[in-house]
Amino acid sequence: MAKKVQAIVKLQIPAGKATPAPPVGTALGPHGVNIMQFTKEFNAKTQDQMGMIIPVVMTVYQDRSFTFITKTPPAPVLIKKELGLNSASGEPNKTKVGQLTKEQVKKIAEIKMPDLNAANLESAMSMIKGTARSMGVTVEE
């Protein structure tokens, strides 16, 4: 018989740096999950992606066991990493903070492809371009 799902928890945690302190502890504590076990498993699974923010979808079962799936980093994080930016533009229409080439957009789209609901690489690239423009990054056509 399948386990009964108690909750689905979504978090964004820096890769390899999950600790029982907030926000992880406060999100998982009410569900009775073994927080130390989760942090060890998450840190081991994301060790190779240090410095990136990794979204996690965690399924908590009624017997307090859990499973989790890591997703690809958010597009803005990948764009900022690619351009070496600390933050996006506060006024994207007025202040531009960088420029992405078509190759850089393609590279980011290929990384994000498993998590995007895009039918092909072209539509994934279009989504990445839109995200970049909303951050104040110009995109080479």
UniProtKB/Swiss-Prot annotation:
InterPro entries: Ribosomal_uL11, Ribosomal_uL11_bac-typ, Ribosomal_uL11_C, Ribosomal_uL11_C_sf, Ribosomal_uL11_N, Ribosomal_uL11_N_sf. GO terms for molecular function: large ribosomal subunit rRNA binding; structural constituent of ribosome. Keywords: Methylation, Ribonucleoprotein, Ribosomal protein, RNA-binding, rRNA-binding. The keyword Phosphoprotein does not apply. It holds the Pfam family Ribosomal_L11. One of its GO terms (biological process) is translation. CDD domains: Ribosomal_L11. One of its GO terms (cellular component) is cytosolic large ribosomal subunit. One or more lysine residues are methylated. Forms part of the ribosomal stalk which helps the ribosome interact with GTP-bound translation factors. PANTHER family: 60S RIBOSOMAL PROTEIN L12 (PTHR11661), LARGE RIBOSOMAL SUBUNIT PROTEIN UL11M (PTHR11661:SF1). NCBIfam families: L11_bact (TIGR01632). Belongs to the universal ribosomal protein uL11 family. HAMAP family: Ribosomal_uL11 (MF_00736). Part of the ribosomal stalk of the 50S ribosomal subunit. Interacts with L10 and the large rRNA to form the base of the stalk. L10 forms an elongated spine to which L12 dimers bind in a sequential fashion forming a multimeric L10(L12)X complex. This is Large ribosomal subunit protein uL11. The gene is rplK.
